[in-house]
Swiss-Prot record:
EC supergroup of this enzyme: translocase
Gene this protein is translated from: nodI
Gene3D superfamilies with a match to the protein in the record: P-loop containing nucleotide triphosphate hydrolases (3.40.50.300)
Name of the molecule in the record: Nod factor export ATP-binding protein I
Job description of the protein: Part of the ABC transporter complex NodIJ involved in the export of the nodulation factors (Nod factors), the bacterial signal molecules that induce symbiosis and subsequent nodulation induction. Nod factors are LCO (lipo-chitin oligosaccharide), a modified beta-1,4-linked N-acetylglucosamine oligosaccharide. This subunit is responsible for energy coupling to the transport system.
Entry keyword set: ATP-binding, Cell inner membrane, Cell membrane, Membrane, Nodulation, Nucleotide-binding, Translocase, Transport
One Gene Ontology term of the molecular function aspect: ATP hydrolysis activity
Assembly behavior: The complex is composed of two ATP-binding proteins (NodI) and two transmembrane proteins (NodJ).
Family per record: Belongs to the ABC transporter superfamily. Lipooligosaccharide exporter (TC 3.A.1.102) family.
Domain ABC transporter: 8-238
Residues reported to bind ATP: 40-47
Subcellular location as annotated: Cell inner membrane
Amino acid sequence: MNMSNMAIDLVGVRKSFGDKVIVNDLSFSVARGECFGLLGPNGAGKSTIARMLLGMISPDRGKITVLDEPVPSRARAARVRVGVVPQFDNLEPEFTVRENLLVFGRYFGMSARTIEAVVPSLLEFARLESKADVRVSLLSGGMKRRLTLARALINDPHLLVMDEPTTGLDPHARHLIWERLRALLARGKTILLTTHFMEEAERLCDRLCVLESGCKIAEGKPDALIDEHIGCNVIEIYGGDLDQLRELIRPYARHIEVSGETLFCYARCPDEISVHLRGRTDLRVLQRPPNLEDVFLRLTGREMEK
């Protein structure tokens, strides 16, 4: 990639806490205008990477560049062009929606007049116009998350760093956040997104890095990763004797994984397997297209831990 077009560049980054390695020799780049995802279970190192990008903690070794600034040495210069959506809301609960935006803008040295001028458009973006004078403590979880996103845009940042932006939200609120993020990408914003939601990564990310125990185990476009590592239909089988089922369908399967009480069968011709399972009332069988959950299971031998 052309380095002048990079919003983020990590080379050989390592971070340990005591004897525990949290991020291990990690390298990746994020192009300006793209949504790049860090996908992995809790403990994979996603939040630690985000904190290093923001200059909140320093790597033990390696090189980090954010918006052409070396981090952490020039983290402050980079941060004025970065918007941050933390994993947990840190809004002022007794302030109104409008007051939260007004106060946050002052952290960037913005004048009261400038902040007042941008607040209406941020309220409209977050679909909170009718809640402008409502205390944050009275908002729903989805509304608080949209306000946190709007607050991160107060300084019109070039880059958004979002740590698990939809954790704890119901499906409707999650989809509304996704719609707002797609609107930002259409405006040319760059987004770094950490998530353990497979659907979120597939819907939003142009490219992603799959992490396991601080190590990169795969990187690429979501559909390319699915095609490379799975490339066929998936049959989930629950119930029965898994060892017997494995032997029964092995001749017709490209690959078989067992996770918990579920057998995952990857096959180019799933009908051949369905014929041999017909009439098995003790089984629950689901046939579906492959997804990123299958990629993670294929690479690690286990499901994504929420």
